[in-house]
Amino acid sequence: VTLLGHHHRLQAIQDIVNHVPDIHLYGHITKGTENIGPFKKPLPVRTKEEAFLKYRYAVAIENGQTPHYFSEKIIDPILCWTTPIYWGCSNISKYFPKGSFVEIKDLNAGVGSQVASIIESQHHEENMDALAEARDLILNKYNLIPTIEKALVSDNLWE
């Protein structure tokens, strides 16, 4: 699944780069960039915060669409007040409020043009309350410490 997911992510990034040539890339996807196509050089940052804090949007593509599984790919941008353009967890809307992310349903359905349209929109500015709510959920509900605390004081971890 991981290699297949990485292959889908690479194809999606190639399509996005074709539609948004000014995009900045960050992370392991930039290794072997000769296969991606023309784009601004990879961001020379040391931390994820440096990569996300100055941007309105971040494309976040998981390795698959497993229900109830999401990773730092959606969490890290939200914590940095950046709206994720997200493909992954098939029931992500169960965990985060509408507007706190933009979901891509199908990576094969012109993802590059979808991303180009989203970044030209005011979605980020119009949904800051939802982004704040998503941050609060990450910090105070989904994070490890609140989860352990709840497990210690409750009979039902999922209440």
Summary of predicted features, one role per range:
Residues 1-26, 33-60, 67-159:
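Pol beta-like nucleotidyltransferase catalytic core
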